[in-house]
């Protein structure tokens, strides 16, 4: 029987406790056996100029995942043509790891715009989607409200953003509680976001 692996995509610029709480909750309170935190080199929907280099963001994810046995950093998208789309990554990763059943993890906010994703119908036909709650305007398209391949997980609502953290660091605010200690140390040592 194949292993169920959740894919939690993000720029992780930087990874913060909100990401870890969601990933760990999915690992512990759903039927997913492992969560891969997939560092995206360039999200087609975000400005690239604000991103740290891929290897720095991956290093922060490695540091953040230490001590969480079911959380695994992944750079699977780094060698794919850019800009990349989730449907392409899923096809690539399923071919590379055929003994895993890959599922998407996304916030309710992303589910609301999922129908606009490239080949969203192919994604949902071939992969389950695990959704965690987010506070966001708008509503989920009717076709996804009760879809058989969508599982809603009652994870804590965490309203922390990497944008807020970057801005706070630039303003010399103490954001220690929002970051894993090893991640904060790396950011401080490397003088990032100042």
From Swiss-Prot:
Catalytic activity as recorded in UniProt: nicotinate beta-D-ribonucleotide + ATP + H(+) = deamido-NAD(+) + diphosphate
Record EC number: 2.7.7.18
Listed HAMAP family: NaMN_adenylyltr (MF_00244)
CDD domains linked: NMNAT
GO terms for MF: ATP binding; nicotinate-nucleotide adenylyltransferase activity
Pfam families per record: CTP_transf_like
Job of this protein: Catalyzes the reversible adenylation of nicotinate mononucleotide (NaMN) to nicotinic acid adenine dinucleotide (NaAD).
InterPro entries: Cyt_trans-like, NadD/NMNAT, Rossmann-like_a/b/a_fold
Lineage start: Bacteria, Pseudomonadati, Bacteroidota, Flavobacteriia, Flavobacteriales
Keywords recorded for this protein, A-Z: ATP-binding, NAD, Nucleotide-binding, Nucleotidyltransferase, Pyridine nucleotide biosynthesis, Transferase
NCBIfam families: cyt_tran_rel, nicotinate (nicotinamide) nucleotide adenylyltransferase
Protein name: Probable nicotinate-nucleotide adenylyltransferase
Species assigned in the record: Christiangramia forsetii (strain DSM 17595 / CGMCC 1.15422 / KT0803) (Gramella forsetii)
Family statement drawn from the similarity comment of this UniProt entry: Belongs to the NadD family.
Biological processes per GO annotation: NAD biosynthetic process
Pathway as given in its UniProt record: Cofactor biosynthesis; NAD(+) biosynthesis; deamido-NAD(+) from nicotinate D-ribonucleotide: step 1/1
